[in-house]
Amino acid sequence: MLAVGATLCLLSFLTGATGRLAPDDLCYAEPRKTGPMPRSKPKHQPLLFEAPKVALTAESKGCQLILLDPPIDMGYRLEDKINASIAWFFDFGNCRMPIAYREYYDCVGNAIPSPETCDGYSFTLVKTEGVVEFTIVNMSLLLQPGIYDSGSFIYSALLDMDVLTGRVILNVENDTNYPCGMTHGLTADGNINVDETTHTTPHPRAVGCFPELINFDAWENVTFEEMGIPDPNSFLDDESDYPNTMDCYSWDLYTYPKSLKQAEGPQTLLIGAVGLRILAQAWKFVENETYSQHTRTYTRDAKEVDVTQPSPVQADSVLAKKRTSMKNNPIYSEGKPHAKPFSTIDSIHTEGMKNNPVYSESLMLNVQHSDSITTGGVLHGLQDCDNQLKTVYICLALIGLAHVP
């Protein structure tokens, strides 16, 4: 009887869920530089110490912001100080692509390593494609999944001398009938066949994370180095200098991943950078639907609010004809853009923009018709940006605004 009970316990551990909705206080897009600051660059590189032996599952839908948690039990450990590290990878089958890596130093031995429970932590290595899609929160991976993020995420944790390696199989609902579009993800540039479905059944659209609109100059004093974003001057003008999306390696090849960039900002800043990516993406609004509407409802009830879309026919009709006033929106006031006209982009003075991820007059909320979203989302859109656009987020904004009537 004990053997049967032990077997059932083991099976439940191997198939349990380890993904969860991110707490509401992680859904923000302003640049917060609070809490402990990182100490220096990591001393080591992210490694897969062994093949994962634990497989867990996670679910995501709509615009949800989620945390993938490694199942780490610190309760049995002593309080003696330890060093720790966490690496996250995506498993493409024939190779594993590194996504994020961080080291912690002199941590309380029986607490989850974090900037608050450790005496110090390293800069975070993050995979970037001009925007911050992922970051580490303590030992967990934070992201807003698209339908092309379904797949196997691998964690590799080191707690002093103890190695914990496993995989989290993320299942993203392939319904794209949400304001955030959903057509982005790690496999968007590959040959993965995903059905981009728009469900006919009415369901809430305000599902997930809708960061409060921010002042357009909020990120003015944040550098590319703090966010781990390559200076657009270095890769928009020369595509060959930009890391390959599929930079990954097999189990027996431990080469330093070029696609990981060093983000020197604190954990709170990188969380905001993920929120900024959410805010800057191309949005799909239906008639009489606005972003500020979802921001208000999300603030009141961050789980699900009944703002439904009756049918895909209405979704594909036209952008909202009457937009409500969005006084805090750097783009729209009564539906009119504040940004400089496209014809004047060439004359934008860029001398002070070289280390600024968001040009102070051009942080925009992207709005598109639902039929203008293409597979791959912002990753594909970046390839169409003019070389004169020296800021990634102004580039994203123009992609979206180019489709607004």
From Swiss-Prot:
Q: Which residues are glycosylated?
A: 83, 138, 174, 221, 288
Q: Which GO terms describe its cellular component?
A: membrane; viral envelope; virion membrane
Q: Which Pfam families did the record assign?
A: Herpes_glycop_D (PF01537)
Keyword terms of this UniProt record: Glycoprotein, Membrane, Signal, Transmembrane, Transmembrane helix, Viral envelope protein, Virion
Sum up the protein's function in the record's words.
Chemokine-binding protein that inhibits neutrophils' chemotaxis.
Transmembrane portions of the chain: 389-405
Q: What is the name of this protein?
A: Envelope glycoprotein G
Q: What is its main location?
A: virion
The membrane-topology field of this record reads:
Single-pass type I membrane protein
Subcellular location per UniProt equals: Virion membrane
Highest taxon of the lineage = Viruses
Q: Where is the signal peptide?
A: 1-19
Stated family = Belongs to the alphaherpesvirinae glycoprotein G family.
